[in-house]
């Protein structure tokens, strides 16, 4: 992706988030974006929209199906994408919208990787640690289970990581022995 395309994607995302923020609709926008991104993942819609082999009329039909129960701002955004024939960039734009929402609201997704599933009490403690250590509000808590950690956990928020896993400690110990 070129810098020009990246700038275009970011501009569309910022504009949509600004409009939703002005009308206090960030939560609704975030829900819409997550639902549409889920559709992209389950149907490989991104390939169809970015393919030159798919006629523009078909792309219009596909995006019209996405409009469904979305907010007015999301539907207007999808109409704008169709008018400007930018549907090939829609998936990246929606991801950029989530990033912009996180920046504006200081609310980031938290990924927790542990050797066992977390209890509700542990999840609330993770949210407290994130608020204290990273000075952000925890958005969605994405839980991953990786038995190779042996014990402990890895918390990732906004490109920052806390790794207290036994696996990492063993690796560090191994490096110290060399």
Curated annotation (Swiss-Prot):
GO CC, alphabetical: plasma membrane; proton-transporting ATP synthase complex
GO molecular function: proton-transporting ATP synthase activity, rotational mechanism
Membrane topology, as annotated: Peripheral membrane protein
Keywords: ATP synthesis, Cell membrane, CF(1), Hydrogen ion transport, Ion transport, Membrane, Transport
Localization of this protein: Cell membrane
Family annotation (Pfam families): OSCP
UniProt-listed InterPro entries: ATP_synth_OSCP/delta_N_sf, ATPase_OSCP/dsu
Cystine residue pairs: none
Assembly information from the UniProt record: F-type ATPases have 2 components, F(1) - the catalytic core - and F(0) - the membrane proton channel. F(1) has five subunits: alpha(3), beta(3), gamma(1), delta(1), epsilon(1). F(0) has three main subunits: a(1), b(2) and c(10-14). The alpha and beta chains form an alternating ring which encloses part of the gamma chain. F(1) is attached to F(0) by a central stalk formed by the gamma and epsilon chains, while a peripheral stalk is formed by the delta and b chains.
Family: Belongs to the ATPase delta chain family.
Role noted for this protein: F(1)F(0) ATP synthase produces ATP from ADP in the presence of a proton or sodium gradient. F-type ATPases consist of two structural domains, F(1) containing the extramembraneous catalytic core and F(0) containing the membrane proton channel, linked together by a central stalk and a peripheral stalk. During catalysis, ATP synthesis in the catalytic domain of F(1) is coupled via a rotary mechanism of the central stalk subunits to proton translocation. This protein is part of the stalk that links CF(0) to CF(1). It either transmits conformational changes from CF(0) to CF(1) or is implicated in proton conduction.
PANTHER family: ATP SYNTHASE DELTA CHAIN (PTHR11910)
UniProt name for this protein: ATP synthase subunit delta
Protein source organism: Streptococcus pyogenes serotype M49 (strain NZ131)
Lineage, top ranks: Bacteria, Bacillati, Bacillota, Bacilli, Lactobacillales
């Amino acid at each position: 992706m070129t810098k020009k395309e990246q700038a275009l994607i970011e501009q569309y995302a910022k504009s949509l988030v600004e409009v939703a923020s002005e009308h206090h609709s960030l939560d609704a926008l975030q829900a819409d974006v997550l639902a549409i991104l889920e559709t992209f993942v389950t149907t490989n819609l991104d390939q169809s929209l970015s393919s030159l082999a798919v006629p523009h009329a078909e792309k219009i039909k596909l995006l019209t199906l996405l409009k469904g129960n979305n907010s007015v701002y999301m539907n207007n955004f999808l109409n704008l994408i169709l008018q400007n024939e930018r549907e090939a960039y829609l998936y990246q734009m929606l991801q950029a919208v989530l990033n912009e929402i996180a920046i504006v609201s200081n609310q980031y997704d938290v990924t927790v990787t542990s050797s066992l599933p977390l209890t509700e009490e542990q999840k609330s403690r993770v949210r407290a640690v994130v608020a204290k250590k990273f000075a952000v509000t925890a958005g969605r808590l994405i839980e991953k289970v990786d038995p190779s950690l042996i014990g402990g956990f890895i918390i990732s928020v906004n490109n920052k990581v806390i790794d207290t896993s036994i696996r990492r400690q063993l690796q560090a110990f191994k490096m110290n022995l060399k």
